């Protein structure tokens, strides 16, 4: 097993991904100080799980991420991957190559991977621990590690040996077992307490379970009796309903016959009504026709009058067409023709002028040609003087060139000036807009502050509203739970009041027959003394108040006759004694009270209360009660817990049933608490509604504030964008202004220089002309030719002016002819429209006259039609009156039949109601059976109907089985036929038996079974926990023994190797390792004793720096040789050694190379010489580490490092 490669990405100074590939043997990493060599060691420690930032030479773990340089930005994460060759299966994983990756981000998040799969730090540490690489990282010896080893405590030195020997995993196992033991101790104590408590609860719950089992048997008997009675009721009610149904059917037949006769009469009445309606409709139609014809005749008469008047008006002659233009179209066209002729003449003149212009241009060209020929002749004549005047011509040319250049520069300067003014104006405008927008941004920023504060206030208010709503909701839920709990308690207590004894029977069946109600409801007891008064009253606490002895006798007789059970009755007319104890002022000992003083009763029960409670005192406890009775035997003393003491007897104990008096008091107390709880719930509900409204308002306000803030942010962002654009435009304009200004300055400087050159050249030219001696005579004919050319130029200019004048006159006349032609066409169209309008008016007059004639004919016909419609209307009215008389007779018959059908309908409804009531009673009975017994009606009648005989009871069958087992000749009990009276008595007996049992816990059986099961389960768990504790103690003992054995063997081997290594490093010296507490091998530390040759040193602090380093190296090498690891990493461990000691150490490294891989950071040349491969680490000015490598064996160079930017 050895390290194959190390890949660093963003780790410390390794900004670019860098991969170092290792091989077995010694690998030396060299380079100047500060180049990042030690970062390789830190990366190996970090990827193998190092958690100490100081160990990695940093202040915090995030310092391992590349922090950036002046030329490179910082990175967001650091990642290191180490690949390990596992072909020898040294690591407990089924891979021949294992890669471990650690990754850290700026936010502190860290990730680990093994072969690309995510894992935990513990997984990495456990994977490496089996190969001797533990959390202490003894295989990595960093800078300062040697001094730390010698200055550390003896117990810390022990950790190095334990880690190399693999003891740490045993210690982890022991620590885990001890933690389990601590947890198990708490669980053991809890289980013991639980089993003790369950064992205490089992006995009373077992008694309740027996009572519940007895009650279940009685309830089964009661259920059977009630089911049979319910089935009998259901059969009886169904028979009654069938009889009602038959009567209803007969009544329905009679009703249907009367309804049929009524239907015939109704149809006849409907026929008459239809005929009357038809006649009415026809009469109405005739009436409408008459009205329509009369109105139409009126409209026709009006139309005739209007048409006559229209024909009269249209005969008038229309007005003239138009007076806008007095000229006729022919005159306008003639004028247009004249203008066109003039235009043609002007065009002919224009052509002539153009021809003269062409001739003048030809003449000018000829004259200029002759002038040019004369010039050339003149030049030929003076060519002989050219050489002498060459300098003069050159100067003249230069002057002209310079003058042209000056003119060009002037034009350029003028253009630049215009552009400079434009740029300055644009810059000024842009800057003004920039300042305006900047001012608006300032205003928005001020508003933004207010919006932020407003938003924060609304959010804070919303948070308070949310908290208030949550608080009120929690309080409301608590109040609702309390209300539900109190209602359930009241219902449960009310069930206790529903007694099944004689008092309940009397209250249900003879209410009002001299009965006032129960004593518990009529009497009010002071709170806290209900149990005492219930014990003092005894059976009377559950009694009924009756109106005297007569009512009491009647009630008892009724109970006997109905077999309704027994009841206690209190007489309301019992005379009160003159002076009861409470009123006579008779004193009681301190803490005792008269029972009568604790009771408030109605006037009619005062005598009975005095009779029952006279001589009864209420005390706090049983001791006071016994003392009071011993002093005053004539009294009875009752405690607040319900223990009663009299002369010679005591009644008390536990498991007492609540009396009706106590139950009523508890109900009253619960009702008062319920009223308070409901009031509180209502208050909370109202407060919650208000809080929700407030919350909604606050939510809306917060959303509005947020929207306003977002809108403001959007506006500010847009303003900032506009501000940036304006700033750029202003800067561009200013830069252009500066650039143009600079160009103009440069051009002006060039112009100045050029003018100076022109002046200089002109001076030279003037001097040359003054010294000119040869004058070239100009021929006379050349002057004539030039004059002729000038005259030709004047003629060409005059011809060009004539052409321009002719063109303007032609353009002026060209549009006038078109305008006149359009005017003539418009006048002609107007005259046509006038003729058309006159023809239309004549046609309209003829049409109006024709309409008037036709209207007169139509009016005569309409008047005759109106007379005919009037006659038809009168005849239709007479027919309608005849139909109405016949319809009245039929309606009387319909009314008579309707009354009979109504009576039959009422009778039928009564029968239907009776049938529905019978069905409702049946449905209610079926619903009651379904709800109480969970049986369908059909199953009820099938299994428990009157036709089903009663099977023998369980007791009869048990007696039969017993007799048969005894060998007696017995006959099996036969089923008994159904008898309602017998079943009613059977149900009452079962009810009395349940009443005698008292309050029964119906869940006792299930609770007892569950509790017993839980007790057995917990008992088993308790034994399992004890056994597991014993096993864990055994595991701890085994681990301790294993630690002792492994550590002892490792220490012996390391101590032996230390002697040899120390002697090799210090020839003639002596060194050994010593246990600080040999008697306690589990906690003993290790001391190092070193005596270099020729020195008597007892303390390590007296050694020199090199001797300390060699001693620490000796201890590490001893550990390495005693318990070899696959690889070791050392960072400048030989820096303090001289050449002799260094070579001794290197000889040890060469021995270690045979078994392990060594990676060493060094500056020493001897160390480099023994290395199998060298890695050179450099750092340029960019602050980023780069690595190069060279394999030393065989002087062959391989590229083992990959750098990528």
Swiss-Prot record:
Keywords: ATP-binding, Coiled coil, Cytoplasm, DNA-binding, Nucleotide-binding
Annotated SMC hinge domain residues: 514-628
GO CC annotations, alphabetized: chromosome; cytosol; peptidoglycan-based cell wall; plasma membrane
Record Pfam families: SMC_hinge, SMC_N
Gene3D superfamilies in the record: 1.20.1060.20, 3.30.70.1620, P-loop containing nucleotide triphosphate hydrolases
UniProt GO MF annotations: ATP binding; ATP hydrolysis activity; DNA binding
GO biological processes: chromosome condensation; chromosome segregation; DNA replication; sister chromatid cohesion
InterPro entries per record: P-loop_NTPase, RecF/RecN/SMC_N, SMC, SMC_hinge, SMC_hinge_sf, SMC_prok
Keyword Aminoacyl-tRNA synthetase assigned: no
Chief location: cytoplasm
Span of the signal peptide: none
Subcellular location: Cytoplasm
Binding sites annotated in the UniProt record for ATP: 32-39
Parts forming coiled coils: 169-288, 330-499, 661-771, 802-836, 979-1033
Tagged with keyword DNA-binding: yes
Quaternary data: Homodimer.
UniProt family annotation: Belongs to the SMC family.
PANTHER family in alphabetical order: STRUCTURAL MAINTENANCE OF CHROMOSOMES PROTEIN 3 (PTHR43977)
UniProt free text on domains: Contains large globular domains required for ATP hydrolysis at each terminus and a third globular domain forming a flexible SMC hinge near the middle of the molecule. These domains are separated by coiled-coil structures.
Function: Required for chromosome condensation and partitioning.
Protein name: Chromosome partition protein Smc
Species the sequence originates in: Mycobacterium tuberculosis (strain ATCC 25618 / H37Rv)
High-level lineage: Bacteria, Bacillati, Actinomycetota, Actinomycetes, Mycobacteriales
Gene name tied to this protein: smc
């Amino acid at each position: 097993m050895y390290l194959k490669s190390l890949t660093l990405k963003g780790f410390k100074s390794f900004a670019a991904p860098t991969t170092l590939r290792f091989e077995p043997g010694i690998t030396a990493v060299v380079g100047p100080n500060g180049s990042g060599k030690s970062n390789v060691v830190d990366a190996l420690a970090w990827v193998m799980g190092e958690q100490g930032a100081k160990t990695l030479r940093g202040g915090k773990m995030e310092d391992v991420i590349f922090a950036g340089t002046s030329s490179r930005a910082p990175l967001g994460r650091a990642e290191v991957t180490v690949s390990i060759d596992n072909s020898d299966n040294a690591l407990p994983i089924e891979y021949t190559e294992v890669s471990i990756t650690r990754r850290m981000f700026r936010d502190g998040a860290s990730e680990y991977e093994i072969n690309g799969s995510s894992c935990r730090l513990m997984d990495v540490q456990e994977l490496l621990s089996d190969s001797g690489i533990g959390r202490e990282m003894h295989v990595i010896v960093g800078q300062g590690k040697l001094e730390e080893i010698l200055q550390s405590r003896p117990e810390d030195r022990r950790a190095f040996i334990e880690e190399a020997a693999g003891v740490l995993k045993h210690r982890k196992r022991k620590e885990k077992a001890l933690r389990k033991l601590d947890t198990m101790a708490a669980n053991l104590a809890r289980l013991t307490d639980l089993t003790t408590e369950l064992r205490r609860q089992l006995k009373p719950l077992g008694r309740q379970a027996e009572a519940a089992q007895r009650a279940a048997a009685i309830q089964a008997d009661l259920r059977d009796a009630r089911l049979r009675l319910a089935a009998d009721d259901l059969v009886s009610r169904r028979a009654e309903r069938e009889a009602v149904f038959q009567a209803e059917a007969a009544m329905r037949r009679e009703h249907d016959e009367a309804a049929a006769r009524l239907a015939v009469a109704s149809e006849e009445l409907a026929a008459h009504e239809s005929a009357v309606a038809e006649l009415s409709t026809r009469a109405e139609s005739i009436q409408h026709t008459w009205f329509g014809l009369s109105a139409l005749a009126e409209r026709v008469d009006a139309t005739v009058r209007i048409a006559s008047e229209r024909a009269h008006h249209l005969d008038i002659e229309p007005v003239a067409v138009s007076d806008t233009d007095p000229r006729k179209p022919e005159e306008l066209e003639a004028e247009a023709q004249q203008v066109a002729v003039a235009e043609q003449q002007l065009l002919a003149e224009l052509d002539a002028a153009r021809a003269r212009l062409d001739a003048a241009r030809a003449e000018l060209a000829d004259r200029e040609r002759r002038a040019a020929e004369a010039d050339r002749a003149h030049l030929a004549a003076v060519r002989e003087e050219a050489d002498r005047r060459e300098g003069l011509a050159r100067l003249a040319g230069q002057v002209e060139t310079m003058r042209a250049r000056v003119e060009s520069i002037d034009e350029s300067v003028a253009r630049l000036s215009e552009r400079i003014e434009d740029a300055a104006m644009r810059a000024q405008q842009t800057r003004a807009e920039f300042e305006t927008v900047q001012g608006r941004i300032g205003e928005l920023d001020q508003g933004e502050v207010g919006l932020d504060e407003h938003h924060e206030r609304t959010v804070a208010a919303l948070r308070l509203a949310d908290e208030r709503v949550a608080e009120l909701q929690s309080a409301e839920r608590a109040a609702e739970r309390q209300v539900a709990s109190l209602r359930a308690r009241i219902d449960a207590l009310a069930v206790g009041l529903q007694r099944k004894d004689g008092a309940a029977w009397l209250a249900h069946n003879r209410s009002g027959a001299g009965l006032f109600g129960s004593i518990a409801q009529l009497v009010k007891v002071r709170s806290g003394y209900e149990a005492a008064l219930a014990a003092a009253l005894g059976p009377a606490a559950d009694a009924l108040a009756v109106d005297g002895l007569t009512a009491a006798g009647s009630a008892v007789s009724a109970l006997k006759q109905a077999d309704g059970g027994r009841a206690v009755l209190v007489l309301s007319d019992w005379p009160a004694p003159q002076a009861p104890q409470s009123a006579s002022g008779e004193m009681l000992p301190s803490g005792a009270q008269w029972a009568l003083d604790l009771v408030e009763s109605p006037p009619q029960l005062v005598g009975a209360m005095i009779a029952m409670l006279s001589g009864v005192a209420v005390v706090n406890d049983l001791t006071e009660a016994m003392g009071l009775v011993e002093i005053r035997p004539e009294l009875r003393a009752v405690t607040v817990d319900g223990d009663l003491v009299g002369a010679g007897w005591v009644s008390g104990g536990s498991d007492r049933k609540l009396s009706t008096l106590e139950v009523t008091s508890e109900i009253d107390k619960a009702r008062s608490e319920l009223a308070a709880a409901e009031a509180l719930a209502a208050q909370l509900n109202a407060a919650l509604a208000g809080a929700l409204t407030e919350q909604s308002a606050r939510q809306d306000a917060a959303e509005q504030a947020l929207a306003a803030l977002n809108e403001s942010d959007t506006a500010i962002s847009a303003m900032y964008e506009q501000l940036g654009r304006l700033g750029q435009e202003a800067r561009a304009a200013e830069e252009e202004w500066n650039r143009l200004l600079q160009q103009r300055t440069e051009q002006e400087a060039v112009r100045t220089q050029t003018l100076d050159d022109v002046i200089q050249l002109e001076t030279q030219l003037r001097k040359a002309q003054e010294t000119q001696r040869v004058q070239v005579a100009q021929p006379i004919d050349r002057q004539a030719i030039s004059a002729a050319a000038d005259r030709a130029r004047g003629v060409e200019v005059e011809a060009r002016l004539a052409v321009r004048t002719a063109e303007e006159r032609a353009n002026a006349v060209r549009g006038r002819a078109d305008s006149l032609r359009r005017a003539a066409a418009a006048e002609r169209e107007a005259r046509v429209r006038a003729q058309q309008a006159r023809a239309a008016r004549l046609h309209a007059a003829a049409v109006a006259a024709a309409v008037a004639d036709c209207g007169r004919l139509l009016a005569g016909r309409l008047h005759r039609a109106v007379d005919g419609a009037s006659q038809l209307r009168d005849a239709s009215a007479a027919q309608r009156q005849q139909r109405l008389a016949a319809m009245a007779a039929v309606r009387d018959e319909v009314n008579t039949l309707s009354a009979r059908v109504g009576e039959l309908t009422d009778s039928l409804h009564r029968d239907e109601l009776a049938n529905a009531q019978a069905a409702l009673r049946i449905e209610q009975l079926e619903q009651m059976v379904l709800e109480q017994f969970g049986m369908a009606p059909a199953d009820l009648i099938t299994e428990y109907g009157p036709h089903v005989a009663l099977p023998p009871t369980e007791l009869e069958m048990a007696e039969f089985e017993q007799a048969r087992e005894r060998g007696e000749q017995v006959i099996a009990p036969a089923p008994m036929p159904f008898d309602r009276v017998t079943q009613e008595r059977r149900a009452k007996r079962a009810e009395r038996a349940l009443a005698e049992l008292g309050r029964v816990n119906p869940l006792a059986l299930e609770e007892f079974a569950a509790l017993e099961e839980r007790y057995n389960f917990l008992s088993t768990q308790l034994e399992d926990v004890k056994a597991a504790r014993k096993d864990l103690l055994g595991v701890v003992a085994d681990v301790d023994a294993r630690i002792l054995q492994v550590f002892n063997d490792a220490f012996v081997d390391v101590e032996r190797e230390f002697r040899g290594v120390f002697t090799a490093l210090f020839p003639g010296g002596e060194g050994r390792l010593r246990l600080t507490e040999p008697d306690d091998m589990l906690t003993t530390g290790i001391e190092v004793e070193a005596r270099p040759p020729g020195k008597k040193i007892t303390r390590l602090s007296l050694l020199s720096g090199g001797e300390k380093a060699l001693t620490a190296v000796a201890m590490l090498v001893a550990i390495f040789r005693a318990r070899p690891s696959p690889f070791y990493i050392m960072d400048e461990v030989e820096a303090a050694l001289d050449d002799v000691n260094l070579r001794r150490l290197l000889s040890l490294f060469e021995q270690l190379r045979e078994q392990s891989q060594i990676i060493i950071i060094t500056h020493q040349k001897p160390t480099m010489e023994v290395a199998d491969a060298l890695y050179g680490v450099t750092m340029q000015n960019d602050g980023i580490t780069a690595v190069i490598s060279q394999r030393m064996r065989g002087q062959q160079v391989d590229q083992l490092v990959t750098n990528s930017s």
